[in-house]
Amino acid sequence: PAPRGTPQIEVTFEVDANGILNVKAEDKGTGKSEKITITNDKGRLSQEEIERMVREAEEFAEEDKKVKERIDARNGLETYVYNMKNQINDKDKLADKLESDEKEKIETAVKEALEWLDDNQSAEKEDYEEKLKEVEAVCNPIITAVYQRSGGASGGSSSSEEDGHDEL
């Protein structure tokens, strides 16, 4: 209870799902009430702004896809080139199995590809793919020949051993 002469006012606050605030004040003594609704439009996006942003996202989706494809193509080329570089220098891989002229051809192709990558930072997807084909055209036949030689050598020795067993 408030001292005599002090009005008793009941204030009710309600916030709905849209963030709209409804305030109701009622004077208990007179029964008179007032109501006000407060909306906070500042900082909120209008429907037009939302639609514009969706349109822009759709417009840029195609461009983003092209950029991703370009980056993937560049990464594919870089990965192949660095794998070749590692294989020809790693004794556990191809370093000991390559002839000097084969190693030189691969080293030259790798060096040229790395220089090309440095000089063509913003090349198109097709350019990266074309360069990858060029490097593969040099490296793959050599790698295939090395594997055939090493596979053929072990196959030859096993057939010799079998022949040896037949002779015994």
Curated annotation (Swiss-Prot):
Q: Which GO terms describe its cellular component?
A: endoplasmic reticulum lumen
Iron found in the keyword field: no
Q: Where in the cell is it found?
A: Endoplasmic reticulum lumen
The family database entries (InterPro entries) matched by this protein are listed as: HSP70_C_sf, HSP70_peptide-bd_sf, Hsp_70_fam
Q: Where is this motif: Prevents secretion from ER?
A: 165-168
The record's GO molecular-function terms, alphabetically, read:
ATP binding; ATP-dependent protein folding chaperone
Cystine crosslinks = none
Q: Which residues are glycosylated?
A: 120
* UniProt keywords, alphabetically: ATP-binding, Endoplasmic reticulum, Glycoprotein, Nucleotide-binding
Region Disordered: list its residue ranges. 148-168
Q: Which Pfam families match?
A: HSP70
Q: What role does it play?
A: Probably plays a role in facilitating the assembly of multimeric protein complexes inside the ER.
Family in the record: Belongs to the heat shock protein 70 family.
Name this protein carries in UniProt? Luminal-binding protein 3
Species: Nicotiana tabacum
Q: What is the lineage of its organism?
A: Eukaryota, Viridiplantae, Streptophyta, Embryophyta, Tracheophyta
Q: Which gene is the coding source of this polypeptide chain?
A: BIP3
